[in-house]
UniProtKB/Swiss-Prot annotation:
EC nos: 4.3.3.6
Protein name: Pyridoxal 5'-phosphate synthase subunit PdxS
PROSITE patterns tied to this protein: PDXS_SNZ_2
UniProt source species: Desulfitobacterium hafniense (strain Y51)
RNA-binding keyword on record: no
One GO BP: amino acid metabolic process
Gene: pdxS
Keywords for this protein: Lyase, Pyridoxal phosphate, Schiff base
């Protein structure tokens, strides 16, 4: 992928800014998400809560199922591949998916290397829990970053921790003298020009969404107020009592994230939220996969 293509991919990801991306497992769910105002959907066979409950090895979804969702909606469709599994990424590119998420939700295929995303034309989304991870993924060709959070839990604490960590490290880097940036680039294991960009612009070179544990309109607004440019919602919608109403409320919450009165109205009468798992009760932390 040449520089021009990468810039185009970054612009494609920019178009999702201020939006909500929802996990869906069927064409029917995809239609509900589109009608609710989702800017994109993530097609997968099992949502993170089910992956966590079932355990075992989780892999890329069946391409036939992904195609069914692509045919059902007009908004962009994303799909997940395993960390380091470049052949799964090749398959997803062949079915003409709009975005690929190299995701820690699935079982990693490579515990050393991530995919060289510069070899693909399709834009990639990657998770990060700190600035070093974010910049390393961008250096590999990611066009969009999201917090890792802790998928399938309905517990927002990890997403908050990761977003605050990235913001704190950006502020620290922005305040450095230029002669300190070379050492910082070495420590973060990324090229100097990426570190310089963050120093000068006080932000990542790509969009940064929040993901992992978003279950309510309040959760979505919290992540936006902390600096997220959009939100991924996985298990929180279709594991709740009234998915359609909750989906609409979360989309509106992202748009009106600074208005507590609107957020109060949106939070009323949504039915039961997903049950959720407390961070302290989890044996397997997916966020620790892929550094």
């Amino acid at each position: 992928m040449d520089r021009k293509r990468y810039e185009l991919n970054k612009e494609l990801a920019q178009m999702l800014k201020g939006g909500v991306i929802m996990d869906v497992t069927t064409p029917e769910q995809a239609k509900i998400a589109e009608a609710a105002g989702a800017c994109a959907v993530m097609a997968l066979e099992r949502i993170p809560a089910d992956i966590r409950a079932v355990g075992g090895v989780s892999r890329m979804s069946d391409p036939k199922m992904i195609k069914g969702i692509m045919e059902a909606v007009s908004i962009p469709v994303m799909a997940k591949c395993r960390i380091g599994h470049f052949v799964e990424a090749q398959i997803l590119e062949a079915v003409e998916i709009d975005y690929i998420d190299e995701s820690e939700v699935l079982s990693p295929a490579d515990d050393v290397y991530h995919i060289d995303k510069t070899r693909f034309k399709v834009p990639f989304v990657c998770g990060a829990k700190d600035l070093g991870e974010a910049l390393r993924r961008i250096n590999e060709g990611a066009a969009m970053i999201r917090t890792k959070g802790e998928p399938g839990t309905g517990d927002i604490v990890q997403a908050v921790r990761h977003m605050r960590m990235i913001n704190r490290q950006i502020s620290r880097l922005a305040g450095m003298r230029e002669d300190e940036l070379f050492q910082e680039a070495k420590e973060l294991q990324v090229p100097y020009d990426l570190v310089l960009y963050v120093h000068e612009h006080k932000r990542l070179p790509v969009v940064n969404f929040a993901a992992g544990g978003v279950a309510t309109p309040g959760d979505a607004a919290l992540m936006m107020q902390l600096g997220a440019e959009g939100v991924f919602v996985g298990s929180g919608i279709f594991k709740s009592g009234d998915p359609e109403k909750r989906a609409q409320a979360i989309v509106k919450a992202v748009t009106n994230y600074q208005d507590p009165k609107v957020l109060a109205e949106l939070s009323e009468d949504l039915g039961e939220a997903m049950v959720g798992i407390n961070e302290q009760e989890i044996e397997l932390l997916m966020a620790e996969r892929g550094k």
